[in-house]
């Protein structure tokens, strides 16, 4: 999300000019009638209402008989204040030459609008909203003009003014001030938000470029429930639902993170469950626990949501229903076994050690596949060992049968080159 804040666009300049009448010799009323506005340290011109332009009038402060400006000033029905300050605020009265009161004007001082601060957030893949706040307190009545358009690719000048790219008005929320909502946005498109602040002394605009995947922040999960697990003094079962504002679709899922802590413990433990429930296995026995959940897009677009309201739960301290003995039989051994089990399930003091009985979530098919793999590797190992043993026995047996026969392993040295053997020449004398 990038921000580019500058002057007014061409469309907003025309609207702001109609609203801001500071360029007129006698500004029109902006807001309540009979009120004019000025900026501290700047000159201000007041016009006497109810008289025609150029009519000489006298000016007084309301409740003060001292003359501020006489009819011979040459300014007609106008009063010019060179540099106004906070003491100059108040009501001014103008009178014609015949002493008839022409009217009253109230002067209020303030400042032109500064560039507003704008931020946007999307709670799903189709809608997003933008909020803003003034850059500075102007002290004057203020209006906001909001619009948006779809950004085009660089060089696509023909599409810049296309009806398919806007601009369109961003409807302001009547129930929540300083907020407008865009419906039916395209997830992979980039939009430019235009927020213009206008008051009697001027206007200022902020342009904000947004992408839905970067401003996505779901609402917190709803319906969080925390329940004990009967027979397990170290476990709690938490469940929740998707936020109502998230349109759950097969391609747009949420992932969750869960935090929990015992009462009077400030540190949170965090896990990332799969699905809409989680069994906590390392709670502190006998203590209530606070649990909260937040959500995020499954592919990590945007940011994590705010935390849901905390829900509380206390681990179970009783036995499983099917483990409760039949007390009518009165067997001593059964009573001793139950007492021993109660001692193991409900220790005298809370234990911080993990539960030694973990949940078995393994799939039976996975167990069969593991056993089959172990069997195959065992057979291969036995076959390789048997083959190696057979080769070793064969080589040992062939070495005991006699001298080594010429073959691949026989030395490749001529007989006449062996040391200690005379070199016999095949001559007639040798044959005789």
Curated annotation (Swiss-Prot):
Disulfide bridges in this chain: 48-94, 120-130, 170-180
Membrane topology: Single-pass type I membrane protein
Organ and tissue specificity: Expression restricted to testis, lymph node and thymus. Highest level in testis.
SUPFAM superfamilies per UniProt: Fibronectin type III, Immunoglobulin
Region (Disordered), start-end ranges: 151-170
GO CC annotation, single: membrane
The Fibronectin type-III domain, residue ranges: 112-219, 220-317
Glycosylation sites (chain numbering): 127, 194
Chain ranges for the short sequence motif WSXWS motif as given in the UniProt record: 304-308
Extracellular side of membrane: 24-372
Signal peptide (from-to): 1-23
Membrane-spanning segments: 373-393
Membrane side Cytoplasmic: residue ranges: 394-432
Highest taxon, organism lineage: Eukaryota
UniProt keyword list: Disulfide bond, Glycoprotein, Immunoglobulin domain, Membrane, Receptor, Repeat, Signal, Transmembrane, Transmembrane helix
Domain Ig-like C2-type: 27-110
Subcellular location as annotated: Membrane
Complex formation: On ligand binding, forms a multimer complex with IL6ST/gp130.
Cited function: Receptor for interleukin-11. The receptor systems for IL6, LIF, OSM, CNTF, IL11 and CT1 can utilize IL6ST for initiating signal transmission. The IL11/IL11RA/IL6ST complex may be involved in the control of proliferation and/or differentiation of skeletogenic progenitor or other mesenchymal cells.
Note: Il11ra2 appears to arise through gene duplication of ancestral origin and has been lost in some inbred mouse strains.
Family of this protein: Belongs to the type I cytokine receptor family. Type 3 subfamily.
PANTHER family to which the protein is assigned, alphabetical: INTERLEUKIN-27 SUBUNIT BETA (PTHR48483:SF2)
Name of the protein described by the UniProt record: Interleukin-11 receptor subunit alpha-2
